Every structure is written in C-alpha cells, then in structure tokens.
C-alpha cells in the first residue's frame, strides 16, 4: 500500500449475503483521479464493510494516509456512522462524507458520526478545497462552497459549489485510483454526461435537475480505447454507460455508436446503456444505432403499468410508447431489455397491482424472450417530491431512514394496505412473472435461436439474464436447448421428410429422476402424460436406434398394428415428446 493524502471508501454490510454492484459507483474513483491530477495522492475502494475496515486499519496504523472520505447512500448511513466514529476514535484523522445521501444528512448525523464535513452535490472542486484546508492549512471552511459542517455548536450550510461545465477536463480513472489493483477487472463503467433534464417525482437526480453537461464523443471513446488497450489479452470485456441521459441527443448517440462499432472491430466487447422511453419513441433510429453497435442490454425507465401512475411519476411517457419501444428494441436485436415496476408508490392499491401485473405480462409477451421485469418497492429517496409530499400520492412513508429495509421490504403503506400487504404483492408478482416466463418457454413462444443466445458462452455474469435463470430451473428445457446449442442433435422441423426415419430420437433427461406414476398403465414426465405404446417410444428414445428401427422393434410387441399405423403412432408420439422438450434427434 502506497502513502496517500486521502483514501475514499464506499462500504456496505453484506446484507442478505449479497454484494452491492459497485461497478457503477464512479464517484469516489473520479474524485481520486481528479485529486491525483491536481497534485495530491488519492486512492479509492468499494466493497464490504469488514474488508474495508481492515484496509483502513492497515493504512492508518502504518501512517500511510492523512485523511478519509466516505461515500454515503440510502443503504449505508449506519455503516458510515460506525466507520466515522471508529476512525476519529482510533486514528484522529479528518473524515469527510459525500454521496447521494449527503443532502439528506443533518445535525444528528454529524453529532453521532463525528465527521468533520459533509460534501453536498458534485464533489471534485469542493474536495480539492477541503484537501488544501485540512492538509495545507489554506483557507477556511466558511469560504468553501458545497459543504455542511458544525462549528461552535452551530450548523453551517454553505452555498452550492459551482458545477464543472467542461467534463472533458476530468481525467480518466486509471489503476492508480484503486487501492486494490483493478487490472484484472474487465468491466468499465463510464459516465458520458452529468445532470438530468427530467423531473421524475421518485428520483433523487430528477429533483435537483442540475444543468445537463456532456463529455465530447471523442473524449468518451478515448477512455474506452485506453481501457481496451490496457486489456489486449482479456476476454469478456463489458462496458456500462451509467448515465440516464445517454439517449437524450440522437446525433450524439449515433456518433458514439459509430465509434463503438470501430472499436469492436479491433477488440470485441459487450455493452449496456440506459434508455429514456419518450426520447426513444420520438427518435427510434437511436435504437437501431445502439443495436447495430452491439449493445447486449438496455435498461428502460418504465416503472409503472398504468397511465395514471406514469403521469404521477412525471415520466413523460405513455403506455403505447412503452410498447412501441419494447417491440423496436426486440426487432433491432437487443438481447436483454430490462425495466422495473415499482410497487407501493404513487396511488398504489390492489387494482393498480393487478394492472401492473397484467402489463408486465404483456411486455414479456411482446419481448419474446428479451424483456426482463424487476419488481421493486418504492424507495423514499431524499428530497424527491413523493418523499417530501407522500400525501399527494395517497401513501404513507414508514421508514425514510432505511432502517428496516434495503429494497427487500416495503417502506410505505396506504389506507387500505399495510407494508406487509405490499410486500406480499411483491412476492406474488415475482412468482407470477416467473410462472409466465416458464409458460412461454413450455409453449414454444420464444424462438429457438433466441433461447440459444442466453447460454453463457464464457464465464461472465454480465451475459446472463433473467430468462437464463428461468430456463435453468427447468431441467428438461435446459438440456434440450443445450444439446441443440452444441450441435449434437436437431429438431424435427430441421429434418427433411426423406430422412425422418433415419434419425435417432434421444431423451434429454434421466427417466428415474423425473417420472411420476399416474396409474399402472400411465406415467407423467414433467407435463407430458404417456400411456401404452407412448411409454415404449420414450423408452427406446436413447439415440441408439433410428425411428425406422424403433418401429420395427415395436412391431414385434404390437403386431396388431400395420406398419403404417405403427409409423403414425411413433411419429405422433415423438412430435408430442418434442413439443414438451423431452427428445431431440441425432443424425447418427
């Protein structure tokens, strides 16, 4: 560990045995890059609480750090109180707090944590001034913009800091910004702009509506090119565009996508972006640009399945626009189209839930294996219109401090529904959508070609979507499609009539694991009921005999049938088995 002027940490408990997705948390690494550019030594770490505490102990006990910065969001307020108390007690270092929750923190937080300063909004210019103040004794807190602090028993909230207009002046995040080496990480999160022109009533970013600023296309592509050059021999590279305004300007999207196509010719990678429904509806050509440039996944801000709630959220989109964009993304070839449906938000009721569920199922049908719907509870993020005025939206907020949930349990109630009721609706919706996806798979509503794209070709979680997890819970379908993917067998529609009798039917699962006895003459294999001669066709479907030979073998047992009658029975049985994804057909 090198000596640093400041270390930044974004730490969370391993709640629910889950690790937060730190890939998109650029803030503390961007701060480190900016400070390094301006003559200081800074590094950052994002990870689990106890792992981070060990790194803090190592740095502080060896006197390799002069100052600590902690990232605070709605989930880790209590972690930051503990860490700040610990650092101040054990090492007596200045501690500053920043992040999206910073504007909601108050005197009580300062008193409990003992932090020196809270940084509000954009941090680069403010933190640079704080470094000069704490380490070089330059200036005074009273003259630094964008902070809150307590002095002589009084809370001071300073005017907002000036925003950085020219984002191209910000340095790229490099490996020197990481407390632990990042060179083995093949995932790049990249921000192409700041600010948001939209005013979603549930969104922290939308509340502040700070001026939208963009990096130049050349600057964005240069960062990606540098990342790729540093990983010439890496595989499974994934680029995440994390800003909500990626699809705001059509020409800019076109220019970025043209650049991405050129870069992918040199070094292939998958990528993800966010998309705004209304702008994509007005300019659907952007979807073509994104798809042609190889985007694997797009996240759309849908949030609700009724126009009343969409309007309450000020989404600026309509139900018909959502369906149009979904179909356009599907037809353009984007493999994964993700969005959330919020439960427990504006005007929530049982009726709204039923409409949300029906709309989610409609989107799954439209997507034909591309659409993924996440179920989330409304989060009372700080300073949003719903959080500030819940009565306007017919809800009550029970836990603004996120003390009882981190997205896994409802934090609101209505006059008719408790938080438990809303949480049961969340559970029900997850189950219903899972069943609906399984039904679509069983009914062959998803093109085989698309199903085969779900299989992870390499060891990368980014290639795996919800449809893959759904498929993986259905052993016969998983085996059926895997055999097809490997080219070891075909489906009946891929076999010509003149060769049909020469192919070898082959079961895809072990019988003893999944057969159920219905009666002395009838069995059930998953959803397929088989009786009499059908059972024997299944038994002989081991890939060792052609259909012609199976017919001959069965003619010995069932000699009351003519050859043509037996042929029809066998072929119809095999069609039945294939429809249920229980057999495939090998050429040899």
Residue ranges and their predicted role:
Residues 23, 168-336, 343-345, 358:
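Radical SAM [4Fe-4S] cluster-binding motif and immediate context
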Residues 15-18, 198, 238, 308, ...:
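Flexible glycine/acidic-rich beta-alpha junction loops that bind and position SAM and/or redox cofactors
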Residues 15-28:
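Glycine- and acidic-residue-enriched helix-capping/strand-helix junction motifs
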Residues 106-112, 286, 347-362:
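Catalytic cores of alpha/beta
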Residues 2-9, 17, 37, 41, ...:
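Radical SAM enzyme core and accessory elements
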Residues 38-40, 88-93, 137-139, 261-269, ...:
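Short helix-capping segments at alpha-helix termini
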Residues 10, 44-48, 71, 207, ...:
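Residue-level recognition of beta-strand->loop/alpha-helix junctions
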């Amino acid at each position: 560990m090198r000596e640093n002027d400041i270390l930044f940490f974004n730490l969370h408990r391993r709640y629910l045995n889950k690790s937060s997705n730190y890939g998109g948390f650029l803030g503390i690494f961007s701060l480190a890059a900016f400070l390094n550019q301006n003559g200081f030594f800074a590094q950052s770490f994002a990870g689990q609480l106890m792992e981070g505490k060990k790194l803090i102990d190592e740095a502080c006990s060896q006197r390799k750090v002069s100052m600590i910065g902690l990232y605070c969001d709605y989930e880790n307020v209590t972690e930051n109180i503990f860490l700040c108390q610990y650092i101040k007690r054990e090492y007596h270092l200045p501690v500053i707090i920043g992040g999206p929750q910073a504007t909601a923190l108050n005197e009580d937080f300062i008193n409990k944590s003992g932090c020196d300063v809270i940084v509000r909004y954009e941090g680069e210019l403010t933190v640079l001034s704080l470094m000069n103040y704490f380490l070089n004794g330059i200036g005074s807190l009273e003259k630094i913009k964008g902070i809150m602090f307590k002095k002589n028993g009084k809370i001071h909230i300073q005017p907002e800091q000036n925003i950085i207009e020219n984002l191209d002046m910000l340095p790229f995040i490099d490996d020197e910004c990481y407390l632990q080496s990042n060179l083995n990480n093949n995932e790049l999160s990249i921000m192409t702009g700041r600010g948001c022109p939209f005013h979603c009533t549930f969104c922290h970013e939308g509340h502040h509506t700070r001026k939208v600023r963009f990096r130049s296309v050349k600057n964005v592509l240069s960062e990606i090119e540098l990342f790729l050059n540093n990983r010439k021999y890496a595989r499974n590279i994934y680029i995440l565009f994390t800003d909500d305004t990626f699809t705001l300007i059509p020409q800019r999207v076109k220019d970025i996508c043209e650049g991405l196509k050129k870069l992918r010719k040199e070094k292939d990678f998958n990528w993800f972006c966010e998309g705004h429904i209304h702008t994509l509806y007005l300019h659907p050509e952007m979807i073509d640009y994104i798809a042609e440039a190889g985007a694997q996944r797009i996240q759309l801000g849908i949030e609700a399945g009724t126009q009343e709630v969409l309007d309450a959220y000020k989404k600026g989109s309509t139900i018909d626009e959502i369906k149009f964009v979904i179909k356009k993304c599907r037809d353009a070839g984007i493999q994964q189209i993700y969005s959330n449906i919020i439960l427990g938000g504006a005007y929530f009721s049982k009726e709204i839930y039923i409409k949300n569920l029906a709309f989610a199922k409609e989107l799954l049908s439209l997507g034909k294996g591309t659409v993924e719907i996440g179920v989330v509870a409304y989060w009372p993020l700080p300073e949003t219109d719903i959080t500030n005025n819940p009565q306007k939206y017919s809800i009550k907020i029970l836990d603004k401090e996120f003390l009882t949930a981190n997205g896994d349990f409802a934090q609101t109630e209505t006059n008719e529904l408790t938080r438990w009721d809303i949480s049961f609706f969340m559970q029900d919706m997850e189950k219903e959508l899972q069943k609906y996806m399984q039904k679509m798979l069983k009914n062959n509503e998803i093109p085989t070609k698309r199903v085969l794209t779900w299989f992870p070709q390499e060891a990368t979680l980014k290639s795996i979507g919800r449809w893959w997890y759904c498929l993986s819970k259905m052993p016969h379908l998983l085996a059926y499609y895997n055999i097809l993917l490997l080219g070891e067998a075909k489906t009946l529609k891929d076999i010509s009539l003149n060769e049909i009798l020469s192919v070898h039917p082959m079961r895809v699962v072990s019988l003893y694991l999944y057969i159920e006895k219905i009666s002395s003459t009838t069995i059930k294999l998953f959803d397929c009921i088989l009786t009499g001669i059908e059972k024997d066709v299944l038994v002989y479907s081991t890939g060792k005999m052609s259909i012609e030979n199976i017919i001959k073998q069965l003619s010995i047992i069932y000699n009351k049938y003519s050859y043509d009658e037996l042929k029809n029975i066998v072929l119809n049985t095999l069609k039945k088995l294939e429809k249920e994804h229980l057999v495939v057909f090998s050429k040899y």
